């Protein structure tokens, strides 16, 4: 009677090969070859342990007997359902857990052709749909209240007001606001615009309204003087006499502050 570790059946039934490959994947391939962070490796290790726990709890396969054959298409589909229905994890979490298993199978198939059919079949197991969250927009009156929330007395308040006006006019992300430099403003162009560095390191040019141009000219005079440094951060703070660009967290706090002010 042949067992699961019988080499005549191939490596996909070999439990020793499974555990040895998993160890090399986690301890050598990920940190040394792929240069993954300790956090990522820990996440992969946890995900693989969860899958092995599923095989024991649901499929009755003892931990020491697990082999690559147990990660076939049907078991992976059942694994997804188990994570979603029994564990009640979000689709994103379920998909991340599945990705770790597929990554191990991909590595194992490169090490041994016996695992290739298992890996190929795993690629037909698609992740769960991640529902897109509905985007909620400000009403005109709400947006007007937010833009008027900063005061005029403090210098920082006047800076914050300019940030809100420009961010609203150009539909900018927080990270794009922090990345703006003086040279990104093209106020004297036939159609005034700003040059924004967006996701993927790609620039885009966005026209701005005449009223915004007027606000920016006043802001530049106050915050950057008559001869602005082109590479200076457009929006900055001063600490110990030194200018430095604002962080994303800083702008998030500004937005939260004025949003709470508008609710009162």
Model-derived segments and their meaning:
Residues 1-264:
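Conserved catalytic core of the tyrosine transesterase superfamily
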């Amino acid at each position: 009677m042949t067992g699961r570790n019988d080499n005549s059946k191939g490596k996909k039934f070999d439990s020793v090969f499974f555990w040895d490959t998993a160890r090399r994947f986690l301890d050598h391939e990920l940190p040394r070859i792929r240069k993954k962070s300790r956090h990522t490796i820990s996440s992969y290790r946890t995900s693989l342990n969860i899958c092995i726990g599923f095989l024991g709890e649901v499929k009755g396969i003892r931990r020491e007997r697990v082999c690559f054959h147990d990660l076939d298409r049907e078991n992976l589909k059942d694994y997804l359902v188990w994570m979603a229905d029994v564990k009640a994890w979000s689709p994103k979490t379920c998909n991340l857990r599945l990705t770790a298993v597929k990554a191990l199978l991909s590595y194992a198939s490169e090490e041994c052709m016996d695992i290739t059919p298992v890996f190929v079949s795993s690629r037909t197991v698609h992740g769960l749909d991640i529902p897109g969250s509905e985007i909620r927009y400000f009403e005109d009156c709400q947006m007007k209240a937010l833009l008027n929330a900063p005061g005029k007395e403090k210098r920082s308040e006047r800076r914050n007001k300019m940030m809100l006006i420009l961010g609203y006019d150009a539909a900018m992300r927080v990270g794009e606001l922090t990345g703006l430099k003086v040279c990104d403003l093209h106020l004297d162009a036939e159609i005034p615009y700003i040059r924004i560095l967006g996701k993927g390191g790609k620039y885009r040019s966005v026209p701005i309204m005449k009223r915004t141009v007027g606000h920016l000219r006043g802001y530049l005079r106050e915050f950057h003087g008559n001869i602005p440094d082109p590479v200076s951060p457009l929006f900055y703070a001063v600490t110990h006499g030194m200018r430095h660009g604002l962080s994303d967290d800083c702008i998030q706090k500004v937005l939260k502050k004025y949003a709470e002010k508008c609710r009162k």
